[in-house]
Amino acid sequence: MKGTPSFGKMNKTPTHVRCRRCGRNSFNARKGYCAACGFGRSKKIRRYSWQNKKVNGVRLV
């Protein structure tokens, strides 16, 4: 079977499970990498300058 009935089976298992490196629930079990820290994709921690922002709008380091 393909198409619309098959898409109903996609919500049985969780897409993201807890990451071993960052501890967040962002590790894609099927693809094998973390969306938050990049574990499984690279040795370096995934980090961007636009990630953190203070309440007054000033960006943190």
Curated annotation (Swiss-Prot):
Its cofactor is Zn(2+). Binds 1 zinc ion per subunit. SUPFAM superfamilies: Zn-binding ribosomal proteins. It holds the Pfam family Ribosomal_L37e. A zinc finger (C4-type) spans 19-37. GO terms for biological process: translation. One of its GO terms (molecular function) is structural constituent of ribosome. One of its GO terms (cellular component) is cytosolic large ribosomal subunit. InterPro entries: Ribosomal_eL37, Ribosomal_eL37/eL43, Ribosomal_eL37_CS, Ribosomal_zn-bd. Zn(2+) binds at C19, C22, C34, C37. Keywords: Metal-binding, Ribonucleoprotein, Ribosomal protein, RNA-binding, rRNA-binding, Zinc, Zinc-finger. It comes from the Archaea. Binds to the 23S rRNA. PANTHER family: 60S RIBOSOMAL PROTEIN L37, RIBOSOMAL PROTEIN L37. Belongs to the eukaryotic ribosomal protein eL37 family. NCBIfam families: PRK04179.1. This is Large ribosomal subunit protein eL37. The gene is rpl37e.
